[in-house]
Amino acid sequence: SFKEKSKNLDIFRAFPANKKISKFNSYFTGYFATVPYFGAVHENTFPPKNNYISLMKNHILEPVTIHGEGWINKWDVSKQTKNSIELVFKHNGKKNYPYAYKAKQTFKLKNKSLIISISLENIDKDFFYCGIGFHPWFNLSEFSKIHSNSFTYLKKIKKEKLIKSKMLKSNALDLNKYKIDETFLDWNGKSKLIINKNLSLIIKNKNNVNNLHVFSPPKKNFFCIEPVTNIRDAFYTKK
């Protein structure tokens, strides 16, 4: 688990003691990477060579395929030091996602920061659409709130029409009041997250991640704040 040591407070949601580490129990972890895309891929929306197809469902708790292969497969340790670790995952393109790729993920502790880096390398013979997402989970409290520069999202006004819309005018979103599953556009790469009255943190991205996804489901004791390169339902929206 990832904790604030001096106060023994969970930063990421702790893995349940009554669960075993397994492929499908990644759903209950405190963090995972989403590669080679973030979000769901609905039926007949994935466009290899401009032919729209469906991908196989990849998780028993989800109605459609979601978040790619990285979050439900083992990663190999390629490097390790006393304050960092590098993990590698290779997908051969033969099952579900039809392209081969190599993902690399590093975790580094520096002063009071956890630095997570993800890279994605195309090792297929063909070009393909891809994306990256950082998917941490946090425990919800009455104080949980995200301060960010943009709460602009794509709002569906007709079956085939989307427009940019602001969810709220202020720069603070109350995670108890707003129960949403939405990608916010034009993120400037820096947000302040208040988890509870004793714990807050700064989420930063140096470059190339322009969206911030907020998942705050009703009647649940958790939420997710996710820096992502592609918006939710990206292939459906593109189609």
Label for each model-derived stretch:
Residues M56-N111:
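Extended, loop-rich substrate-binding clefts of extracytoplasmic carbohydrate-active enzymes
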Residues N50, I116-L120, I225:
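Buried hydrophobic-core signal for structured, non-transmembrane domains
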Residues S26-F28, G93, K102, K179-K239:
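Beta-strand-rich recognition/accessory modules
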Residues K7-D10, F46-N51, S78-I85, K108-S113, ...:
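A short, structured loop/turn motif at beta-sheet edges
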Residues F127-Y129, W137-N208:
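Active-site/ligand-binding surface loops and adjacent short beta/alpha elements
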Residues Y37-A40, G68-I72, P98-K102, C130-G131, ...:
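Short solvent-exposed loop/turn micro-motifs enriched in small/polar/acidic residues
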Residues S1-E4, F89-C130, F134-F138:
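Acidic, contiguous internal or C-terminal segments within carbohydrate-active enzymes
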Residues S1-I53, G189-N208:
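Beta-strand-rich N-terminal accessory domains
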